[in-house]
């Protein structure tokens, strides 16, 4: 199976949906932040490994604790995934912290600051010319 085949894309979507459901409703580890979401999943073409990109809303300590909690629950998550997703091999899951949402929020704030500064400068120039 090729990496970007229709079958692989469908498997990625199914694993993403089930992984999100397992993390949200079945894991009771207090280290895992309730504001945790699965952003993307990449299942290898041989179905042996899976990269799960996780986004955590919170500070850096909360993010590290969540990843640690998910790694400790990896065996349980894999068993639950095997029960819900019908695959020949249940992939070994690697959790990767995805900070793209935080990066986007930070960039948006910077753009807003520059726009606000530009507007202030524009108003000051207009006041001086009058």
Swiss-Prot record:
Record keyword Protein biosynthesis present: no
Hydrolase found in the keyword field: no
Domain of life of the source: Bacteria
Q: Which PROSITE patterns does the record associate with it?
A: RBFA
Output the GO biological process annotations, alphabetical, semicolon-separated: maturation of SSU-rRNA
Q: Which UniProt keywords apply?
A: Cytoplasm, Ribosome biogenesis
Q: What does this protein do?
A: One of several proteins that assist in the late maturation steps of the functional core of the 30S ribosomal subunit. Associates with free 30S ribosomal subunits (but not with 30S subunits that are part of 70S ribosomes or polysomes). Required for efficient processing of 16S rRNA. May interact with the 5'-terminal helix region of 16S rRNA.
Q: According to its UniProt record, which protein family does this protein belong to?
A: Belongs to the RbfA family.
Its Gene Ontology molecular function terms? ribosomal small subunit binding
Q: Which gene encodes it?
A: rbfA
GO CC, alphabetical: cytosol
Identify the taxonomic lineage of the organism of origin: Bacteria, Bacillati, Bacillota, Clostridia, Lachnospirales
Q: How does it assemble?
A: Monomer. Binds 30S ribosomal subunits, but not 50S ribosomal subunits or 70S ribosomes.
Its predominant location is cytoplasm
PANTHER family, per the entry: RIBOSOME-BINDING FACTOR A, CHLOROPLASTIC-RELATED (PTHR33515:SF1)
What Gene3D superfamilies does the entry give? 3.30.300.20
Species source reads Lachnospira eligens (strain ATCC 27750 / DSM 3376 / VPI C15-48 / C15-B4)
Protein name per Swiss-Prot or TrEMBL: Ribosome-binding factor A
Q: Mind telling me which InterPro entries this protein's record contains?
A: KH_dom-like_a/b, RbfA, RbfA_dom_sf, Ribosome-bd_factorA_CS
């Amino acid at each position: 199976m090729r990496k970007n085949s229709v079958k692989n894309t469908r498997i990625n979507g199914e694993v993403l949906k089930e992984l999100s459901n397992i993390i949200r409703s079945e894991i009771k580890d207090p280290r895992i932040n309730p504001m945790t979401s699965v952003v993307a999943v990449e299942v290898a073409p041989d179905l042996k490994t899976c990269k799960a990109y996780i986004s955590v809303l919170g500070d850096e300590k909360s993010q590290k604790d969540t990843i640690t909690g998910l790694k400790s629950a990896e065996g349980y998550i894999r068993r639950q995934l095997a029960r819900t997703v019908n695959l020949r091999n249940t992939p070994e899951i690697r959790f990767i912290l995805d900070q793209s949402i935080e990066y986007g929020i930070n960039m948006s704030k910077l753009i807003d600051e520059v726009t606000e500064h530009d507007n202030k400068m524009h108003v000051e120039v207009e006041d001086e010319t009058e």
